[in-house]
């Protein structure tokens, strides 16, 4: 192909000469002036709730720590001043805590007793279900064995049938009668270059190199053409 129809580029003209027309090559034009974003990828969404929850938890921890420090300072001040009201308050809180512990222990004991009773009933039902599943598995195993034996019998029968049909030596014609086997002759038996015994040769036969006048060719003509 020729390129005479195309305009001459600036590199071909030289440095001194400048292009008089406004034709530019596509490579000299500005390219990739805008970014292309893929449409099949979605922008990741930032979940701000998780960050807010973390900040709130940190604030709660700080407030709790500050409250504990303030309580300890108040206790120390009451001890130094000789104020017995804080001692009474502390003793009350200790008594309340002990009462709560006793109540929790009672609830735990009641729950543990209920769980033991429920677990006992579950064990009984579980034993029954295990016995049923064991019986079902035994039945399934028996069914699988029976099906396997039937399939093996069918395969053996099919093999025997195939051998009887395919192999003529295995075919049985009758108990008293002898089998009449028909062995198919090979195509090599009717060739012109078959090795024949000297006893079968007749005195009248004469050897010839002419394939058209040979005995094989004459037999072929009489069989298929004449």
From Swiss-Prot:
Biological process (GO), any one: mRNA splicing, via spliceosome
Gene Ontology CC terms, in alphabetical order: catalytic step 2 spliceosome; nucleus
Region span, Disordered: 1-31, 78-134
Keywords for this protein: Coiled coil, mRNA processing, mRNA splicing, Nucleus, Spliceosome
Biased composition (Acidic residues): 119-133
Biased composition (Basic and acidic residues): 7-16, 78-92, 102-118
InterPro entries assigned to the protein according to its UniProt record, in alphabetical order: Cwf_Cwc_15
GO molecular function: RNA binding
Sequence ranges of Polar residues compositional bias: 18-31
Statement: the UniProt record of this protein carries the keyword Nucleus: yes
Subcellular location: Nucleus
Pfam families cross-referenced by the UniProt entry: Cwf_Cwc_15 (PF04889)
Residue ranges the record marks as coiled coil: 126-167
Keyword hit for Lipid biosynthesis: no
Primary localization: nucleus
Family: Belongs to the CWC15 family.
Subunit structure: Associated with the spliceosome.
Function: Involved in pre-mRNA splicing.
The name this protein goes by in its record: Pre-mRNA-splicing factor CWC15
Originating organism: Debaryomyces hansenii (strain ATCC 36239 / CBS 767 / BCRC 21394 / JCM 1990 / NBRC 0083 / IGC 2968)
């Amino acid at each position: 192909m020729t390129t005479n129809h195309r305009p001459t580029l600036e590199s071909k003209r030289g440095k001194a000469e400048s292009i008089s027309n406004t034709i530019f090559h596509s490579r000299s034009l500005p390219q990739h002036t805008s970014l292309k974003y893929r449409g099949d990828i979605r922008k990741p969404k930032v979940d701000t709730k998780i960050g807010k929850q973390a900040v709130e938890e940190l604030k709660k921890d700080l407030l709790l720590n500050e409250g504990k420090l303030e309580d300890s300072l108040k206790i120390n001040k009451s001890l130094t001043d000789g104020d017995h009201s804080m001692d009474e308050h502390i003793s009350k809180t200790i008594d309340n805590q002990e009462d709560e512990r006793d109540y929790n222990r009672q609830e735990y004991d009641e729950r543990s007793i209920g769980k033991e009773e429920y677990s006992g009933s579950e064990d009984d039902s579980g034993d029954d279900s295990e016995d049923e599943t064991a019986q079902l598995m035994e039945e399934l195993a028996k069914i699988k064995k029976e099906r396997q034996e039937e399939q093996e019998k069918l395969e053996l029968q099919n093999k025997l049938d195939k051998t009887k049909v395919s192999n003529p030596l295995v075919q049985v014609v009758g108990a008293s009668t002898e089998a009449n086997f028909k062995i198919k002759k090979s195509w090599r038996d009717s060739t012109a270059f078959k090795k024949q015994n000297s006893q079968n040769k007749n005195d009248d036969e004469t050897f010839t190199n002419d394939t058209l006048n040979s005995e094989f060719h004459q037999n072929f003509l009489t069989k298929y053409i004449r």
